[in-house]
Structure formats: structure tokens, C-alpha cells
Amino acid sequence: MEANKNTYSRLGDTIETVERIEFCINSNESIIRHSAIVDPNGITEAETFNSNNNEPVQGGVIDKRLGVTESHLECSTCGETALRCPGHFGHIKFVEPVFHMGYLIYLKHILSCICIRCNKLLVYKNEKEIAALIKNKQGKQRFAEIRSICKKVTHCQKENYGCGTPAHKISIDKRNGNIFLLAEPVKRTDEYDETGETRKRPQQILTPQLCYDILKSVSDEDCIIMGFDPAKSRPEDMIILNFPVPPVQVRPSIRAEILSSPTMDDDLTHKLIDIIKSNENLKNTKGDGSLIKYTSINDDFMLLQLHVATFFANDMAGLARSQQKNKKVTKSMSERLRGKEGRIRGNLMGKRVDMSARTVITSDPNIALNEVGVPLIIAKNLTFDEIVTEHNIEYLTQLVKNGKRVYPGANFVIKHVIDAEGNESGHIYHLKYVDKPISLKPGDIVKRQLIDGDIVIFNRQPSLHKLSMMGHKCHVIPDNNLLTFRVNVSVTDPYNADFDGDEMNLHVPQSIQTATEILLIANASRRFVSPATSNIAIKAKQDTLMGSYVQTEPDMEIDWRDAMSILMSTSVKLDNDIPKYQNVSGKFLYSQIIPEGLNITKRKNDKEFQLKIKNGELTDGTLGKSEISSILQRIWFQYGSKETQEFIDDAQRMILQFLMRYGYTVSIKDTVIGEKVNQYIYDLIETKRKETLAFITEYDNDPYVMTKDAFEIKLQENLKSVQDEIKNTVMRNFDKNSGIFIAISSGSSGEPMNAGQIAGCIGQVIVEGKRIQIRFNGRTLPMFPKFDDSAFSRGFCRNSFIEGLGPFEFFFQVMAGREGIINTAIKTADTGYIQRKLVKMLEDIKQEYDGTVRNANGKLISCVYGDNGINTENQVDQKIDLISANDNKVRNDYVYTEDEIKYLIKNHKTDKRYTTDLNNSLYRKLISMRDQLRRIQRLVNLTSAEFKETYKMPVDIQQFIFNIINRDVRNNNVVVDPYYVLKMIKDMYYGSDSKIMKYNNRTSRIKKEDEKRIKFLMKIYLYDVLAPKKCTHVYKFSKQEFDEIVDYFKKTIMLAKVEGGEMVGFVAAQSIGEPVTQTNLKSFHKSGTGKTVSGGLVRVKELLGISKNIKTPITEIILEEKYKNDKITASRIASYLKYTTLRDVVEKADVIYDPEPFSKDGLMKKDGVDNIFDQEQGKTGCQTDIKNLPWVLRIMLSKEKMIERNINMLEIKTSFCRNWGTRNEDKTSKKEFNKVIDKITQCAIVTNYDNSQVPIVHVRFDANNYNLNTLIQFQEMVINTYKIKGISNITESNNIIEESYVDFDDEGNVVKKKQYVIIAEGINLSEMSQINGIDLLRTKCNDIVTIYEMYGVEAARTAFIKEFTAAIESSGGFSNYQHIEILADAITHMGGLIPVNRHGANKLDTDPFSRASFEKTVEQLLAAAVFGESDHMRSVSARIMVGALINGGTGCFDLLLDHKKIQQSLVESEEVVAPVVPIKKKTVLDDLISKKKSK
């Protein structure tokens, strides 16, 4: 037994929690102080092992004082073996100081802020403005402010403070592999030398020694002003005098068992050897008394500097990469820290773990939804720590006896031992080698093997969202030949798994607390609803859907014997009444697994039901995908997780048993359609083909009727409509009992589009969002004519898959398939990175117990989570009929007439408190709430053709009412008092049970008003479904029934609120990231505009990066009320918007020398140009006297283009003179244009007339100093940059569309109206505000930055939510508003726009470890050291790094236990003997007995 005590642990050791980690620069003195090498020179031997005794060389790079990594050696510093020695630092004393490459940029900035002569700050530190500037700033912010001030200083010139030396510009020079800091004066004494050439500024090389001397003289006060803490980080410590040698443990040398064999040293050890050799060479070179050339010392020093630089970072620009003898690039210190495989992300944030398994998954129809089948070989290797108690000692003793080989057994035993000194320890016994029995005692720990019922975490990578890791119960498979995990098919959707070779991971929790949390929180049976969409995520799949469809068809009859056999596989009770000796319907059989009391009604139309369930009995409807999802959703919200899981398990087992008996198959004959249908499809294709040809001919005859893009989109839509018609035709003509029809109709597999392509026609192939493009030689493929736009040439495939593809059709199909493969490959990398950025941005945001949402440092992100404080898993879609009701309907359906009130009072159904005035007041309130919600919807989407009636609610009162109405027995003789109903409605949304925000009713008036605003939608919903008239006349509630609804509401609303400690940021990041992975890479067509805008992944990246230059800037211009139906005004405004220069209308331009402008045979006479612009503007403006202007820029214009853009000669002359007069005010013009302007002395413009046959413009000018380049640049400037009309950045504005929108008349009726909307490409809201006719308050654009700059952060936040939602939905994705709102709040909570990338992360108030775990790991850690930052272990990343529990979820609170009360409650329980319950004979039992007797 002694041989088994090979490892041990201290049970009594306490693990302290890390409260704070402070960063500082490791000073040269500190390096010496912490070094294990006593010799002042440190490590001096560039050797590893002694060749004589194979021991580490004394004073070498693996000196035993630095630690040991071989088991037979002992550390000379701590005396421990390799197992216990932590390792110790050493040092190398450098002959010359060298730069630390990580701090070089900071040295540059610091030296730029101080005088290199007197070593003082360039700014006078006692000036008031300096003190005010840095008053509330620390660290980086303060240093940035000082740097910006010092950039403006030219001399160290403050009287009685500075020395008058010119300030210097510091730069880093890495030429020829050397590393220098260069200083050159920023102020030149002489601008030019005697020859007129620019005088070179003198440069000074700042060596590390000189920099060290300068920085050492900087005072502590100046350090503090610059943002440094001199107690932690003095600037001179950024220069290395003593080089720290890392312990051997982080760079172990590998040696074979034969001691004389060569070693394999770590890359860092190789670099240390190079550093020592270079340092010793430099020492010898400097120490030699002979005359030594300066270049030799410099070369040796630069080699030492290079080796030190590549030790820290071996991939710096400008420096050669360090290599070993075998040409392998050395892995530096920084490379070990950063990146996915680095120490931070690879070993601290995530790591390999014990007690985990991975193998392929296979489906198992008999395993429960929350179970996982575990192979026996895995169950015998994974263990759970079971503490021995008096209750389980016998059971665990038996497991220990079984050992590791006999299942179920145990693998290890940890015996609790107390030594003579009172120290507690645990001796570990490996049961594989035990040859004697082990006696267990209470307190011992047995690592037993997995058994049935153990809780594990099941995971499939990539873990994109919360449901990628869920808890399951083990079900051990007792067969050594079965080696895969067994999984229920229905649970694969959240994992995004299938059974084509997917592998999944299994993790075993190692404590009862962890297992309990997994069981109660992460259990698969409790994770039915997706937080991203609030919809059921775990659904019935494939065979279950198909079998349900077949079983519930109206004519399906099942033999009663089969029915009983089928139900035996479910959890249905044995006493269910199944009629014998007669067939039963499939609906009846299915009803047996539906919970009793469930009521659902979904209508297909006024006469037919799509689904009807009453009190758990399925009476109407054939169950497909949507119907079963509706059932699951209702069971989940009405009954809970247990019943929902039972329904899925029972449905799957029942349907599989049903299919085994009744069968299902798909064959080729299922896809065959009749000859008439084929002819119909052929005729339809021919009709569309001819329509396409006719449209092409029309466009060719008049190409100005629309743009090329609009033409292509119209053709594409016309041809795509063929597929819709064909798929509907094929589905209508399929045999309703064919396998393929059943598969598609049930939602089990495939879509109608697939059926249409299989049996009808493949249709239009789309590549890159368009028809097949004409590319090589004007053709799509060589067999088509040039520039052929017809259907077949551009990718329309008329054949079906049954008929087979032609050669060109096959090629087109392959093109589309190739695009899909490429998009998937690109999208995988992009979306993965987007999700990571989202997680790092939002990971610290959580719900606090005060109702607010805050980050790790307590900064407020949102006052209320998602604007309603409701957990997204606890909300359901509810329709509010009041929104669409007109005034008359509100009067009839929601409030009483006077006669009805009198009747209620007369029959004592209400007292006199419900008066006519109260009734009228209720009517006005309902109308007011309805109109307010309508106005809000109009403001949200001004051009929407529909309005929203369905909203997410935390309660489903309508379903609860439906359940009450469908009760068999109701006590509704006395209806509820309507006054009581109104009173309780007010109590429901104002009461403390439904309070969302935490506030004091007396003092928090503002919060109270916010609470009303937040619950406004809830208020409308309550009045809509519980209006007094509905309660008394429609539902006919008794008071007891109405009170049930009130109690249900209060209980549900309490449970629906988001819990304190919920990491809502993490959930939001995952809920947004997961649908982003489903988005496409392309743009989408904006209906009616003939244009495409960025959508999908491209737009998501723009929004998250807060891009200032978006790919498709669009402005949707709404006209003022009086012009919204005036197309002429809309066209006039649109024509003015487009930015137009002379280049847009020019045909030809020349520069001509014409010294005699008024000559009879001159240029002006020839061109008919005599219309001089005679508006006198002084010498700086356009001139009227052109005699002394010999140069002419002759511009010939296109008359057609001028007419198209509504431009005349007067506009050209006016705009030219305006541009010329303000030429010196344009700060955005190019430098070469400014030089041209300086050379042009005078300018004038002369034109012919609007009715001239060829419009010609002469721009005459003179120049004091010109050459050919000057003339060319002047021509380019006038033609390309001088604006004639329009608004800057607006590149197109001729898209005027007539859009429908929803409005309401005076009686509250919904009215569809139309208005003209201008779609402009480009954005410039500030200039648009100057144009009459544009309603700028309703005009919208898709540029978040522009909105922020014009309207502020709140407008930008709203616009971001709208644009981001549209970007996701453009590709069919969806994410709840709450998640996008959290993202928008995180981006805008600091008052500006914070991009979701590393630049945005640096702006956030986060701790160093949190920033380092994202990107630029080494740079972040170095910055933290420079500014002496502290990490207070508040962020998620920091706490994971140090192995601490995060401050979220179950880790954000503590449990207090009163031991005295527990002791007082302990009582001895007497042994209880349960009475024997006699078996009652049932039908099944009688059948079995009679069957036995008959035998």
C-alpha cells in the first residue's frame, strides 16, 4: 500500500482570493533584488550542461539556482525537486544599457515632452491652464494631454524655469537593423541657406546611455504631471541595465534518458546564450587597452541590442528575424503571451481540463431528451468525488472493492490523514495497483466511476450561444463495443449538430454544488426557449414531424392492439381508456400524450381549423412543424419543463413505434407529375421568356427609361416569379399520400422550392445577388451570342432535376454552388471574429439587484434591461386588437352603452360606482392609448405599409382566459363587477408585484414616471384583453375566475423579470452573434428603388465598427406635407440634390493661348462666345475685362447631359465665379491646387447661349508663373472640383418612388396612403436642411456617425438599433430587441460612439487583464506597467485568469447559514414502515391474466 502513496495534497491549505494585481516596470534595482544569482555580474556563462559530469553549468543559463526541471536534481535556491520548485529569476549585468523594445514608443513620447538639455518639462507645470487640464485625468489620459500641449512648444523658454533650448522632435530609426532614437529641433533658426536650399536640421543620436541619464534626472513631480507613478514606474527603468533571466521552468531543456545525449534547449535559452555571448564580446572589446575602432564597439553593441529586442519580440518591422542554426525562427517572449495559442487565451482564459471526454455522436430514439448515452469505456475513466459518510460507506466500500476494472467501481481513494504536527493531508491511492483492501472512514474521498443519473455538461463546438452547453443525465451503455455518445434527435438543434460524424464534448462536474447548479439551471429540459428569439429551441425533428403528420391525418385509423403496443413505449398511464376490438383514430392516439387541460385553437380560415385542441384532446388539424411547435410553446408556458420534456419524449417514441408498423418510403415515382402539368409549366416558361425578350427590346429602344440596375432587377424579379408559380403548381399536383409531399408538408425535410426544382423547373440561377454576368468577350458562355440578355443566356434553367440538366445549365448550377462554398469559408472566419468582439465588449455587463444594468466597474449602462426588465426566455407573442380598432369598434367592444350600464345596476351586477362618466372616461382613455401607440409606430417607421399588432409580453392572459372558457364546469352565474375589474387592472400594472424599477413611491417621482413609460405597452395589453365589457359579456367571468387571472398575472410577472446577477451582456453577445453567422455576405435590393444597399455581414461589420465611410450611404428624403403627393416638386428637388461638376456635362476640354480675344477670326468669334459674366466681384473674383487674360480653358459641353441634369449657362457661370471667389477658403483642396491658385492672378468666364447648337465655355486667365504642369492642374481643378449645383456627397438622386404608408382617419380607421419619397445615394443632412420642401425631421439616413454629429447620442442609439435590426433581418435572422438594445447602450453609454473592436475596448473603463485578453496582449500589459495601473479583479476575464468565481450568476451573492437554528431543528427520526398497498385490477392486468389462462 505504501507504493501507492506517490502523490499527496494538503487538505488544510487555504487558497486566498486575489483582490488586486498591481502593474509596474521591473526596475533595474528590483531585478538585482529578486535575482537568485549573488554575483553582481549575474549569468556569465553561455553554456548549458557541463560535459564532464552532465550537470548544469554553474553560472550558466540553466544554473540550478534558477530552478530544476529534471527529477533527479534539486534546486540550489529552495532545495526542492522539479515537482515542487517554482523556479527563480536570475540576471545578466549589461556592459552598456540597451533599449527595451516594448517601451521604445513610450521613451520617444516622454523625450518629446522634456528638454533634453535641462531635463525639465517643456510646459510650465505651475500654469493654471495646465493644472486645470490634467486635474481629473490620470495615467494615459493625462499623458496624452501633456503630449498634445508639448507638440505646440518650440522652446524650453519659460523665464526662470527653462533653458531656452529648442524643443526636439524624437523619432525611432531602425535602418540597417540598428535601433536609434534621433532628436532634431522643431524650430529652425534659418529657413534657407545662402543657395536658397532648405537648411538641414541638425540631428542628435540618443543612445540608451544618454536616454538613461536624461530620464534619471527627470523629477518625480514631472513624472506625476505626465501621468506616471514614480513609486512604481520611473521612466529610466524602461532602459535595461540588468537583464532578467527567466526561471528554467518556463524554458525547460529536454534531454533523453541517456545523460550523455545532447539536449534540446528552449528558444528562450538559445536567445539567452546569444545575449550572454554578445554582452561578453562587448565587455572584451571595451576592456582591451589597445586602440579599438569605434565601429567595432558599435557593432557589438548593436548586436546585443538586436538579441535583446528579438528576445522580447521577434517580428518587429525593420529588424531581421532571429533564427536558429536549422533556420527555424525563434519564438520570442511576446509570441508566448499573445494570440489564440498564447498564455493568456490558451492557458488562462481557456485550458485543457481533466474529467472530460470527446467522441462521435449517434442518434438514439429511446434515450430521453435530457439524457446522454455514455460508452462504458468513458464511464470507467471519468470519476466524481464522493465524500464518505455514514450513509454511503457500504456502497462506496463495494465500489472500492470493484476497483477500476469492474464496473461500477472507483479509480482513486483519498485518505484523510492528520500528521503529528496537526497538518491535514490526503494520501491518494490508485486502485489500479491496489493489492490489499482499503478501509474507508467518514471524510475520505472516493473517486467513483460515472453511473446512471450523474449530471454532466454536454457541449458542441463552436459554442455560439448559451444553449451550446447544457446539462444532461448520464445513461451508461453497458456494451464495450459501443463507443459513441447517444443523443436524442430533438436536442440537436440548439447544438447545431447532426449525425454525419459530428463530435461532442462531455464534462463531469467535480462538486455537488456544481452538479446542482447544472441540474437546476443548465439542464436541457429547462432550456427549451432560446433567449435570442423567445421561441422554442428544442423541437420535434424529421421522423417525429413526418410521423405526426401521417398519424393525425383525418382518415388514419389504427388497430386497437397496435394502439396499445404503441402507447406502451410512452409514459402514458396504464389506466387510460383505450376502446378494445375497434380501430382508433390517429388523433385519438396522439391526444393521449397531450397534457390534460391544454387548449389551442388556430384557424386556417373561417370554416376550417388548422389546429384545435380542447382539454388535451386533438379534435381538428393535421400536425406538422408549426403545429407541434405551437403545442410545445403552450405546454412550456402553461405547465413547465417536466411536461414539455415528457411530451417530446413520448411523441418521439410513439411516432417511431407507429412508423415501424405503418411504414414510410420515398421513391422516384413520387416526383412524377402528369403530362398536362408538364405542358402547363412549359407554356409558363415560354410566356415569361417572351416577356423578357419584349422587355429587353423596349429597353434597347429607350435606355433612358430606367437605369441599367433597375432594368436588371426587373428582369430578375420577372424570371424568379416563374419559380414561385411552378413550386405551387407542383405541390398542388403531387399525390397527397406520396412520401415527398408528406416530408415537405410536415416540415420534416425540404421545402416547396425543392419540389419545384425536382419535378418542374430549376429556374433562375443567382450568383452574387444577380443573374449570371456577361464577362469574357461579351458572353456568359461561348455558345451564346454577344451581349445576349435573354433568359437562357443569363442563367435561367428550364429543365428539372428529373429531366436532367443541359451543359450550360449544369455550368450555371456549379457557379452558384461554388459561390456558396466560398461564402461559407469567408463567413466562418468573419462571423467568428465578430462574435468574439461582441463577447469581449459586453462580457462584464450584468443585471444588478437594484434593477439597473451595469458593467464590472459599476458604470451605468441602462436603467432598465431591455426597456421592460423582462427575461427574454419568459415572453411570448401577444396580439393587441385595440391598435387596429376604430372608434366605433372601441365603443362597441370595449365599453358599455347606457342601456347596458342600467341593466348591470338593475340586476345588481355592479354598484352605482360604475357610472356613465366612468364609462366615457374609459372610452377616452382607450382612444388616447391607442392613438399614442399608433403615433409611436409612425415615428419609428414613417414609410411602413403595415403597422404592428403583435408584441412580446411576459404573460399570456389570452391563453389563460381561453383555458377558463373551455372548462367543463364554470361558476359564472354572477359575473364580476366591472368597477372591480377596472380597479384590479390598475392594481395589476401599478402594484408592487409588477414593479420593474426599484424606487421609493414618495421620493422618486422621476423613476415613477419612467416606470409608467416602461409599462405603457403592458397597460394597453391589460385594457385590451380585460376590458370590463369583455369580462362580463364575452368571457362572462365570475369574480373568482377574474381573481384567478389577477393571481396568475402577478405570479407570472414576478417570475418573468430578469434575475439579479444575470449576465445580460454575455447573453446579448451570443444572441446577436448566433444569427449573424446565418447572414449572407451580399447586398440586398431595396424594393421599388432599382438600387441595392449593403446588408447582411457587410452591413453588420460597418455598424459594429462605427464606420465613417459606409459602402452604400442612402438618404430617404421625406417631403413636407403639402408636397408629398406632388411628383413635379419631388423631381425638381431631386434634380437639385445630385452633386454636379463640369466633368458630368463636359465633352471636350483644351487649354489654348489666345492673346487677342476680340480678333475677328479669333477663338471667341469662332465659338460664338461673347456672353461675359458681368457681375463685378473685385480683384479676387471673376473679371469683366478679358483683354489681359491670354490663356483660355475651352470647354465643350454636352447639350443632352445639360438637359438631363437641368443645367443652363447662367448656373455654370454663377457657380464658377462663386467657386473662384471662395478658392482661398477651401481647406479641403489638394496642396497642388493651392499652388496653382497662388499662380493664377485673374480669371473670367465667357459662354455662348443656352440655345446654341454646341454649348461652349471659355475660362480666361492669366498667370505670373506657369508651366505645362500648372495649366494641366488648373484644368483638372476647374473641371473636376468646381461644383455647378447639388449637395456634396450626393452622387445620385433621380430615384423617386411612390411608397405606401399607414395612416388613420378622424374615426380611427386604418387608411393606406401614398407619398413620393426621394432615395438619394450619399448623405449630407446639414446642406439638405437648407432646401425648401424637405421635411428634415422625417428624412432618414443609414449613417450612424452623421446622425450622432447632427442630433446627438440618443438619436444615434435609436438609429443603431433600427439599422442593426434591419441588417440581421435582411438575411432572415432575428434577435430580440433587448439584446440589440444592450449592444446599443454599450456603444453609446459614454456619450459618444464606441466601436466594437480593440480601439473601442481601449476607450472603455476596463481593467488591464480584460483588455489584454482581447487583442494586443503584450502592448496592453506594457501600458499597464508604464502607468502603474491596478487590476481590481472585477471583470470576468480577470477573475477567470486567476481562477476566481466571477461576480455574476450564482457567484454574485453569498449564502448565510445559521448553524444554531439547524442544530435546534435536528430531531431523531423513527424508522417508518410503509403499509403494503394492494394491487387493484386494471384492464391491462385482466387481459394478461385471461391470456395466461387461455394458454
UniProtKB/Swiss-Prot annotation:
UniProt keyword Transferase present: yes
InterPro entries (alphabetical): DNA-dir_RpoC_beta_prime, RNA_pol_asu, RNA_pol_N, RNA_pol_Rpb1_1, RNA_pol_Rpb1_3, RNA_pol_Rpb1_3_sf, RNA_pol_Rpb1_4, RNA_pol_Rpb1_5
Cellular component, GO annotation: DNA-directed RNA polymerase complex; virion component
Membrane-spanning residues: none
Subcellular location: Virion
SUPFAM superfamilies named among the record's database cross-references: beta and beta-prime subunits of DNA dependent RNA-polymerase (SSF64484)
Protein name (record): DNA-directed RNA polymerase subunit 1
Source species: Acanthamoeba polyphaga mimivirus (APMV)
Gene from which the chain derives: RPO1
